[in-house]
Amino acid sequence: MENVLIFASEKEVRFTKLLKFIVPTYLTSLFNTVYTIIDGIFVSTYVGTNALASINIVYPIVNVLTGIALVFATGGSSVTALYIGGNRKKEADRSFSASSFAAILLGCLVSLMILTNLSAILTILGATPVTIAGCKTYARWWLLAAPVVIGKELFTYFIRVDGAPTYSFITALSGGILNIVLDYILVGQMQMGIYGAALATILGLVLSFSMGIYYFIHKQKYLSFTLHNLSLREAMHCMLNGASEFVNQLAIAVTTIVFNRTVLSFAGEDGVAAVSIIMYLQFLFIGVYFGFSMGIAPSLSYAYGDRKIRICRKLESYARRFFAVAPIIIYALTYFLTPVAVSCFADTSSPVFPIAVSGMRVYGLGFLFSGINIFAAIRMMAYGKGYFSGLITFLRSFLLLLLFLIVLPLKFGLTGVWLAVPAAEALTLLVAVWFLRPIHC
């Protein structure tokens, strides 16, 4: 297999060569974030902040679907990369195929269960009489498109592991551009509201999904689908290795509910709209960390699978330098650019604007710590140690965050809500540093 990220020796490891993988991976993450943000801008501009709040309320459902996709995509791709590094093609194909089939089947079952109880679930998530109609419209589209949503995410990761990060980026870019164009037509020109926004998003995902299928039929370098010797055990192995991503998405779903309900009690529906804006902007900044970490992860897996520990350590030295500098730059950008960024979603005279600006500046303190936490989790997953990855993610995204969301608002009010994330990330960092010790065979 010709793959730019399989290094024969420590001397071959160069940052410029590594960038061939990191840059497309980061751009994929960045562009996914950008077109999600543009989605929000179209909705808030042409439909209103209540519609934006409706989408935010539905996000826990989207997070469940995304979580199912990511648990198999990240876990399965890491296991597959370990097999590729060890030159074990049959096992790599089996891991890839088992992950894909299991993820899509599970996603369809979960979507069906949610659809049959949609009204009750949306009420639990915080839908009000003002937002319930928009919530139902947006949620139904996502649930009905579950196979495409999950398949697109799977292909993004496995195409990258197959040694084609640029093609993976092109699939995301193509779907995103179609989404933006359709947002302009359906939401901006045809005034189709949330229905149009949902349709635009799903059609963009369909394009990316179709390009993924085309790749594995006509352009694959190493991996291929197989029905031979597929086993539940292999699917479970991949799922457990990627458990941290499901924990992350499930945690986002739960904490979004708590965020919405807590902010609702302090600032009403304007506060919920502000949370939506903060979440959009968070994706933009935190995407840098995910892009770098996921970009370097396959190289770590290839080297570890081939027992080339010195290569792993050299790769990690680049990561240490990156995370010594990037968090400071990202927080500085967050602090100074927040007013401009928020004005893309809400008018400066809107009551939503000051809530979002002040909230983002406090919330953004978490970016000083989250990069190392994210890398530590993805690093352990790349080495096939998903249980440690899951622990880091569980702490930062769920346990500590939920604890601080309950405790800090009692003392600091609305500011306490925004402080919960930095507090959770800072405490998790103490654990993450321990997991960044040198790896051994």
Regions found by a protein language model. Give the residues of each.
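Small-residue-rich hydrophobic transmembrane alpha-helices
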Residues: L52-L112, V149-S168, A274-A332, F336-T338, ...
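Hydrophobic transmembrane alpha-helices of multi-pass small-molecule transporters
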Residues: V64-G67, N179-D183, S208-I213, F283-G287, ...
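Short runs within selected transmembrane alpha-helices of multi-pass transporters and secretion channels
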Residues: A73, W142-R160, S168-G176, A197-S210, ...
